[in-house]
A protein has these predicted regions:
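Extended recognition/assembly regions associated with phosphoester-bond processing machinery
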Residues: 1-357
Length: 357
């Protein structure tokens, strides 16, 4: 039976199509449910590790999201600038999020008559991304620096399947790396562990899609809309909780099980066309925003029950360079006197810089 949902008595809510909610209220007329309380989140637990785990050690990451070249050419100058930044600052991990060969680039689309494309999409990826990355890794090895690299595709990648969720971009060994250097190719969305720290990434612009579809009311002044949108992902236990999906999302519902979020990550990477940001997000933020409950601000949340969300922005924006993100995690001391597994408390130990290239 379908009935209309009346939200006038709720001071705060955040709802969108496809969201799974529990509504408490009354239906006196039989055709309108007057909500008194809405529970819209059941986030999974935060990760924990033994006190001897490397998750309590220091860590640095550089994160960039495509496009990796400017709109007017295929010179990949912003990518060169990013690799130069990494060579000088030496992050432990370099995370590269697609698109690498942007299907929306006018040259790739065949719309640039002055510079027609004379190479295949695979050749563009080879000279624009793979060769540069291999040269960077070889030079780094010669200098005694061995970063790990993670690559994740986008539905806008002209060299890959335009379906979401996506398999990894390359097969293992496609990027020739020096001995001891790890180059991992992750699916989209994907979760990977770096020195014990759990990182989740998704190159689908889920924040922009949720922002366009959300209906919300927030009676509290200064509410953080971006943190609220981010919290819907663990709250709904899905990397893409919106249904029906946005028209450009390329979602294959038959593969929905690959969107499941079974653990709230320490760090969540959500590249978007929206403004770059870094936020501490309480795990229960989506519940507080949707229910008749007091607001939760990042500063007030327990660091043990919060995660770090990062939108690094786009490495290239139009004809100019864009931004990348640097994540620094300081060494942490497990709580004395407690054995077994403990939370990583990354939200308390992390600093994020948005760097312009």
């Amino acid at each position: 039976m379908r009935v209309r949902l009346e939200l006038r008595d709720l001071p705060r809510f955040s709802l969108f199509p496809g969201q799974i909610v529990c509504v408490q209220g009354q239906n006196p007329s039989g055709h309108c449910l007057v909500a008194r309380r809405v529970v819209a989140a059941a986030p999974p637990p935060m990760p924990t590790s033994p006190v001897s785990s490397p998750a309590f050690g220091a860590l640095s990451m550089a994160i960039a999201s495509g496009p990796f070249t400017c709109a007017g050419d295929l010179a990949y100058e912003p990518f060169d600038a990013m690799l130069a930044h990494c060579a000088s600052t030496r992050p432990d991990v370099v995370v590269l999020l697609g698109p690498f060969v942007d299907a929306e680039h006018k040259t790739i689309r065949g719309e640039d008559d002055s510079h027609p494309l004379e190479a295949s999409f695979e050749e563009v990826f080879a000279f624009g991304v793979r060769d540069r990355l291999e040269k960077f890794l070889d030079a780094s090895a010669d200098a005694g620096y061995a970063p790990s690299v993670v690559l994740m595709p986008s539905t806008r990648d002209a060299t890959h399947d335009a379906v979401f969720p996506q398999p990894p971009l390359l097969a293992d060994g496609s990027v020739e790396a020096p001995a001891g250097v790890v180059v991992a190719c992750a699916p989209n969305p994907g979760t990977f562990t770096v020195n014990g720290v759990r990182v989740m990434a998704c190159t689908q612009d889920v924040l922009r899609h949720l922002s366009a579809a959300e209906a919300a009311r927030d009676a509290a002044p200064g509410g953080d809309r971006m943190a609220r949108l981010v919290a819907h992902i663990p709250g709904q236990r899905s990397a893409y909780p919106l249904y029906p999906p946005a028209r450009d999302a390329c979602v294959d519902a038959a593969l929905a099980t690959h969107l499941t979020v079974d653990v709230t990550p320490d760090v969540m990477l959500l590249p978007s066309d929206l403004n770059p940001f870094a936020k501490i997000v309480p795990r229960e933020a989506a519940h507080a925003a949707a229910a008749n409950a007091p607001p939760l601000a990042g500063e007030d949340a327990s660091a043990e029950d919060a995660f770090v969300a990062v939108n690094p922005g786009r490495l290239a924006r139009g004809n100019v360079g864009g931004t990348l993100a640097r994540v620094y995690v300081t060494e942490g001391a497990p709580e004395p006197g407690k054995g077994g597994k403990q939370p990583h408390v990354i939200a308390k130990r992390a600093r994020v810089d948005i760097v312009r290239v």
